[in-house]
């Protein structure tokens, strides 16, 4: 089992009130379905399994993101919800095909 990352945040490990604000992914999914999400949620994968970091299978991480996104989008609160997916790592997987060159900038100005 992964070490919950909230335990590395100063003051959380010693505070039962703060620890109570952290829930499992299962609870998050249930809260989303019931329209009980708080004003702000920060969702993390199990880093030893569900992340997209090397050497994990990135498809598992993609499924995790899809499951979270689907739950939020099907929530009764979706109409007034913003969903941001961010990364703190760039991956580490090599793409054997170089990206295409950038488009040539236009010399005309558009108004």
Per-region residue spans from a language model:
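N-terminal pro-sequences and low-complexity stem/linker regions of secreted or lumenal proteins
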Residues: 1-111
């Amino acid at each position: 089992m992964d070490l919950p990352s909230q335990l590395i945040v100063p003051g959380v490990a010693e505070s039962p009130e703060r620890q109570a604000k952290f829930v499992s992914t299962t609870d998050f999914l249930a809260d989303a379905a019931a329209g009980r999400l708080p004003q702000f949620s920060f969702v993390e994968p199990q880093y030893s399994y569900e992340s997209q970091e090397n050497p994990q299978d990135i498809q598992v991480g993609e499924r995790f993101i899809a499951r979270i996104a689907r739950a939020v989008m099907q929530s009764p609160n979706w109409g007034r919800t913003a969903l941001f997916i961010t990364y703190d790592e760039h991956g580490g997987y090599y793409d054997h095909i170089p990206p295409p060159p950038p488009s040539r900038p236009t010399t005309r100005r558009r108004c």
